[in-house]
Amino acid sequence: MNNYLRKLVEGQHLTEEEMYKAGLLLLNENILESEIAAFLVLLKAKGETAEEIYGLVRALREKALPFSNHIQGAMDNCGTGGDGAQTFNISTTSAFVLAGAGVKVAKHGNRAVSSKTGSADLLEELGVNISSTPNEIDYLLEHVGIAFLFAPAMHPALKRIMKIRKELNVPTIFNLIGPLTNPVNLETQFVGIYKRDMLLPVAQVLQKLGRKQALVVNGSGFLDEASLQGENHVVILKDNEIVETSIEPEKYGFSIVKNEEIRGGNSKENAKITLGVLSGEKSVYRDTVLFNAGLALFANGKAKTIEEGITLAAHSIDSGKALAKLNLLIAASNEKLERVN
């Protein structure tokens, strides 16, 4: 590890292979916590490259729980977190809208790290059992159309690093790579990131991971979601080509909504917001979810245009299908799925 730390101190980038090997060392129980913390802070100070991100993703996926990966067409819409905006759980709420529109959603997530309520906290409050095994997750994806992958359970080797991340209390490379380490073999992905300068590197990593289509967004105000506040910077991966562009919410009929207007709270407060959106209540929360789910449906290919994606998202909610997916997941995740274990 000393060689890698020395390179980072000197401001040098690591190669993909060096980062892969460093990643395996980070997951080794014999490494000192001080070395892990130093590595994360130095890497953040230098700035992460696509090669470094992909190298670490390789190491983490190698050490993750094994999946059969027989499920075809799965998508994730997990964001990086780390924007400090304290918004409600936009991507988790949107996941049920996607599922209601017919997308298989493998939602990878965690408890709160830099926010009040993480996706796991919200789902637990709603009554979802977040402790599903890989076999159970496969079952849920096939029969319910949505499953939650609790990151610490999927990546047991990360236990010590999670503790150090919490103590550091600043975004690290692990915020960036969270959405990239989903152990399910995804075909498409919608990723919100808090660092605008990482849009292209993250898209390049998604390309290396073999995604058929993907959309990476940095929202107005550096939100790790698409924002109704103003211009959103976007990178689209399609047909193995990467295109950089920007998206204005007004073009799609939305009113401007400041990011402060969609702040969330604790898990109970955020659960109330999510249930309100899925129940069809008109609000700035609903509009934010429609925008994000619409973009995700476009990224998935379920919709040919963003406009069509927003229309499909609205139908998923207003038909009751999105809320039905939540209720199905609550019921199925709490069953004794002995037949699949």
Swiss-Prot record:
Reactions the enzyme catalyzes: N-(5-phospho-beta-D-ribosyl)anthranilate + diphosphate = 5-phospho-alpha-D-ribose 1-diphosphate + anthranilate
> Which biological pathway?
Amino-acid biosynthesis; L-tryptophan biosynthesis; L-tryptophan from chorismate: step 2/5
Enzyme nomenclature, EC number: 2.4.2.18
Q: How is the cofactor bound?
A: Binds 2 magnesium ions per monomer.
**UniProt xrefs under Pfam families:** Glycos_trans_3N, Glycos_transf_3
Binding locations of anthranilate 1: G79, N110
Q: What cofactors does this protein use?
A: Mg(2+)
Per UniProt, Mg(2+) 1 binds at S91, E225
Q: Which residues bind Mg(2+) 2?
A: D224, E225
Residues annotated for 5-phospho-alpha-D-ribose 1-diphosphate binding in this entry: 79, 82-83, 87, 89-92, 107-115, 119
| Superkingdom classification of source | Bacteria
Per its record, what are the GO molecular function terms? anthranilate phosphoribosyltransferase activity; magnesium ion binding
Any single GO CC term annotated in Swiss-Prot or TrEMBL for this entry: cytosol
Write out the residues that bind anthranilate 2.
Answer: R165
Q: What does this protein do?
A: Catalyzes the transfer of the phosphoribosyl group of 5-phosphorylribose-1-pyrophosphate (PRPP) to anthranilate to yield N-(5'-phosphoribosyl)-anthranilate (PRA).
| Entries under PANTHER family matching the protein | ANTHRANILATE PHOSPHORIBOSYLTRANSFERASE (PTHR43285:SF2)
Instruction: Report the family membership.
Output: Belongs to the anthranilate phosphoribosyltransferase family.
- This protein is called Anthranilate phosphoribosyltransferase
Gene this protein is translated from:
trpD
